[in-house]
Amino acid sequence: MSLRPPRPGGIGVRTPLIDGIDKVTGRAKYTADLFAPGALVGRILRSPHAHARIVAIDTRAAEALEGVHAVCTGDDTPVPFGVLPIAENEYPLARAKVRYRGDPVAAVAAVDQATAERALALIEVEYDVLPAYFTAKAAMKAGAVAIHDDKPNNILREVHAEFGDSAAGFAAADLVREKTFSFAEVNHAHMEPNATLAEYDTERDGVTLHTTTQVPYYVHLKVAACLQIAESQVRVIKPFLGGGFGARTECLHFEIIAALLARKARGTVRLLQTREETFLAHRGRPWTLVKMKIGLQRDGRITALALEATQAGGAYAGYGIITILYTGALMHGIYDIPAIKHDAWPNTTPSATA
């Protein structure tokens, strides 16, 4: 194969991927490949509990450690974020409560990895551990402790929609079948772990982020909102990306945390996450229980289709607030179905992942 760009052409001309040559030759630079002289190392302290109140956080020893340039907690992040304005219920660093094992509690920026790790070890956090529920059904049971105070039944959002007369459609069917399907939680397992390089500009009081995202403009908006600065003070650059598959279609907490650390340290911070942390921060396909009912005529025509879906949406709304709509919006496919009924409940469950 030639490593030269293809000649211009149309039909019949072999056209490789526009970025393929850079990738196969190793010229492509990913976020973790970017080097910034003097960059500090960012690290995140995460909750060991699935659900707990934060009673107290003491960062004084970490702040006093030589080589530490910044320490941030939930006190530095008063603005929540989320994929939609109706579901902004997550903070970059936990405030008052943690809602999954791995929820970010504090973050540090230090001169090197060893110093950053020592600083994390010096941060003291007192927790009041609360009940945790690891299935959607358990979280929805009567008497279950609310994960979010404004959602006492742990149901994030209910979706109910009907098009046509489903009852009449089932009555007219020659055959009605019902079946329940259980879909396991799936992590996208993209090859590149999460990473952000955040640079603070003292002259314009702004930040520039190079980050592993599929949606740089969305990251731009959320970083500005959480840092409480103008959008014009934030620049987001998307380098080559080692996979995403939907897991990086929203702003994630580590991107905002990197920006916070860079601003507080008034410098540059590289925040590289381990594979375990990337799994903890993932926005994978949620566990979903689907009960489907279909009405058919003898000639194969569908008379009605009904779906009930219960989804373990995780500790925060995230993209799940949209995913639950897909369970119904996409179920008809290319078929001619005169009546469709869709009922869905995404719920919040404190768990091992977000």
For every predicted segment, state its role.
Residues 31-40, 191-194, 339-352:
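Flexible hinge/switch segments at interdomain interfaces of large molecular machines
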Residues 38-41, 65-69, 95, 102-105, ...:
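Short coil/turn connectors at secondary-structure junctions
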Residues 44-72, 106-127, 196-265, 322-332:
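Alpha-helical support elements that line or immediately flank enzyme active sites
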Residues 74, 233-239, 266-276, 303-308, ...:
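Beta-strand segments within the central parallel beta-sheet cores of soluble alpha/beta enzyme folds
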Residues 89-116, 246-298, 354:
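Glycine-rich and small/hydrophobic secondary-structure elements
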